[in-house]
Amino acid sequence: MRSLPALPKRLHGPSIWALYILGFLPAVWGFYLGATGRLPGNAVKEFEHLLGIWALRFLIATLAITPIRDLFGVNWLRYRRALGLLAFYYVMMHFLTYMVLDQTLLLPAIVADIARRPFITIGMAALVLLIPLAVTSNIWSIRRLGQRWNKLHRLVYVIAAAGALHFAMSVKVVGPEQMLYLFLVAVLVAWRAVRKRFLRWRRQGTAPMRSQARAG
């Protein structure tokens, strides 16, 4: 299994911080466009949508780390935590934009909106599930929780599916963009289901080759 080529170990930490900086650029740029009146239509809705779509992208990127390693041998595991936390930060910004700028903190209207619109109910449920994952994304929690940590963090697949569904249900007509994200999440969830069988099949397939190499 090879890791990222031509990246010295001393650059692993700086590269993760660079990922955080790059990861926040869409939010900063979107806020700038909104503040200067350059977002089309309803600026609040557009900014809210931008944050939500980037949250979903970072969730998908987080889930894609393992299949990329399994299929192509490229180890990006060191970036998975950063990608997952970026997804959480974008979900929180998406949520706060909805609460503060869209609904202006009118709690009765917010509660009614959650109850009346299923896609918002699903989005809120995904946020609630995501919070414990973000809180436990650290070495101390991994050591403290042990195997329970792995079970807890499998919820990310449910969260990603809920996020894609939230996005698809938020529009009047499901278009190619919504279908793409639903498809990507479905593929990643399916990979999770077949991963062990695939790895077992690959090990069985490479075992005779290793035996022949030793015999030769």
Curated annotation (Swiss-Prot):
It is found in: Cell inner membrane. Heterodimer of a catalytic subunit (MsrP) and a heme-binding subunit (MsrQ). It is a multi-pass membrane protein. PANTHER family: PROTEIN-METHIONINE-SULFOXIDE REDUCTASE HEME-BINDING SUBUNIT MSRQ. InterPro entries: Fe3_Rdtase_TM_dom (IPR013130), MsrQ-like (IPR022837). The chain crosses the membrane at residues 16-36, 48-68, 82-102, 119-139, 155-175. Keywords: Cell inner membrane, Cell membrane, Electron transport, Flavoprotein, FMN, Heme, Iron, Membrane, Metal-binding, Transmembrane, Transmembrane helix, Transport. It comes from Rhizobium meliloti (strain 1021). This is Protein-methionine-sulfoxide reductase heme-binding subunit MsrQ. Binds 1 FMN per subunit. Its cofactor is FMN; heme b. Belongs to the MsrQ family. Part of the MsrPQ system that repairs oxidized periplasmic proteins containing methionine sulfoxide residues (Met-O), using respiratory chain electrons. Thus protects these proteins from oxidative-stress damage caused by reactive species of oxygen and chlorine generated by the host defense mechanisms. MsrPQ is essential for the maintenance of envelope integrity under bleach stress, rescuing a wide series of structurally unrelated periplasmic proteins from methionine oxidation. It holds the Pfam family Ferric_reduct. One of its GO terms (biological process) is protein repair. The lineage of its organism: Bacteria, Pseudomonadati, Pseudomonadota, Alphaproteobacteria, Hyphomicrobiales. One of its GO terms (cellular component) is plasma membrane. NCBIfam families: PRK05419.1-5. GO terms for molecular function: electron transfer activity; FMN binding; heme binding; metal ion binding; oxidoreductase activity, acting on diphenols and related substances as donors.
